[in-house]
Design a protein with these regions (language model features):
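Positively charged, small/polar-rich N-terminal and surface patches that mediate targeting and assembly
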Residues: 1-102
Length: 102
């Protein structure tokens, strides 16, 4: 079992929902997030995800527990989507292994 986390700007939320639907991910959770960076100067790898204290960056985080093959398929679809757009804020997706659960 894998824990998949996806960061998505709200402008691409509909596209993310379509990706979930296309590969039959029927159970996932989402939350709105405000990102902050102490010195948002535009020179770091993550500067497009975090705003300054005065202007936080608003995005969504979606997450789901998936079988490994489904998690890999989801990341492949996110990668395909990112390659199809010209944006400073592509979706970010992470797979985290689940060691134990009860």
């Amino acid at each position: 079992m894998k824990f998949v986390i996806i960061q998505c700007v709200k402008a691409y939320h509909h596209e993310l929902e379509q990706i979930f639907k296309s590969i039959r991910i029927n159970a996932y959770s989402e939350m709105d997030v405000e990102g902050f960076m102490e010195q948002a100067d535009g020179n770091t790898d993550f500067s497009n995800w975090f705003g300054s204290r005065k202007n936080p960056y608003n995005y969504m985080v979606s997450f789901s527990f998936l079988a490994e093959d489904k998690a890999n398929e989801l990341l492949e679809r996110v990668d395909e989507f990112n390659k199809s757009i010209e944006s400073m804020s592509p979706m970010k997706a992470y797979i985290v292994g689940v060691e134990k659960f009860v």
